[in-house]
Amino acid sequence: MMTSSHQSNTTGFKPRRIKTTAKPPRQINNKEPSPATQPVLKCPRCDSVNTKFCYYNNYSLSQPRHYCKNCRRYWTRGGALRNVPIGGSTRNKNKPCSLQVISSPPLFSNGTSSASRELVRNHPSTAMMMMSSGGFSGYMFPLDPNFNLASSSIESLSSFNQDLHQKLQQQRLVTSMFLQDSLPVNEKTVMFQNVELIPPSTVTTDWVFDRFATGGGATSGNHEDNDDGEGNLGNWFHNANNNALL
């Protein structure tokens, strides 16, 4: 019985099949390794090895962008090396302004300023004659021979016009002051010629006091009383007017 059962068990056993299928060989990629795994590149500007890969320019694998930590500048493989300053900057350079500010010339030159002012203060009429004859022309409006109107801009012309306007106002003010100082006394009082100035009459007072001192004539003549208590005063003025007519 034992032998029969053992034979039945051995005859029903099936061995496992071993898979002998080999894996296919790996395909070798022809792509270039990533710049991160490449050896460190030298900076084309300073030949420093302290560089690193940043990113791909315009998402193109053929234009990797690197950064140099030594000179702190970027460069792209196959691209032109631009002269970008450290930290970056705008391409528009700040050009210095070529416009020159025109300084307004003084009213009087340095050499003759004190003499001209003394002449204006002490002798206004003489200074007025010199101005009318062109004596102050060199002091009022000195011109710079190096000034070139063709190279000036709108701003310089506007400033020049403002200076010229100020000088004209100063000249008018000085001219009006000279005219007032040179006018005679009779012309200054022209506006008062139509006013009649009555000189004080000394005849009335002298006559009244003479009559009062002698004690007579103060109450002489017709006594006119207008109910205001001024009858004597009216009589005095009446007699004074009669004596003045005589």
From Swiss-Prot:
KW Zinc (keyword) present: yes
Dof-type Zn finger ranges: 41-95
Subcellular location: Nucleus
InterPro entries referenced in this protein's UniProt entry, alphabetically: Dof, Znf_Dof
Origin: domain of life: Eukaryota
UniProt: Zn(2+) binding residues: 43, 46, 68, 71
GO cellular component: nucleus
Keyword Ribonucleoprotein: no
Sorted UniProt keywords: DNA-binding, Metal-binding, Nucleus, Transcription, Transcription regulation, Zinc, Zinc-finger
GO biological process: floral organ abscission; positive regulation of DNA-templated transcription; regulation of DNA-templated transcription
Tissue: Highly expressed at the base of all organs of the flower, especially in the abscission zone (AZ) of petals, stamens and sepals. Expressed at low levels in sepals, filaments, stigmatic papillae, tips of young siliques, and at the base of pedicels and leaf trichomes.
One Gene Ontology term of the molecular function aspect: zinc ion binding
Annotated spans, Disordered: 1-39, 216-235
Biased composition (Polar residues): 1-12, 27-37
TM ranges: none
Family matches, as Pfam families: Zn_ribbon_Dof
Principal location class: nucleus
Biological role: Transcription factor that binds specifically to a 5'-AA[AG]G-3' consensus core sequence. Involved in the negative regulation of floral organ abscission by binding to the typical DOF 5'-AAAG-3' sequences in the promoter of ADPG2/PGAZAT, and by down-regulating its expression. ADPG2/PGAZAT is an abscission-related and cell wall hydrolyzing polygalacturonase. May act through the interaction with ZFP2, an abscission-related transcription factor.
Assembly information from the UniProt record: Interacts with ZFP2.
Any further remark recorded for this protein: Plants over-expressing DOF4.7 fail in the abscission of floral organs (sepals, petals and stamens) after anthesis.
Name recorded for this polypeptide: Dof zinc finger protein DOF4.7
Species: Arabidopsis thaliana (Mouse-ear cress)
Upper classification of the organism: Eukaryota, Viridiplantae, Streptophyta, Embryophyta, Tracheophyta
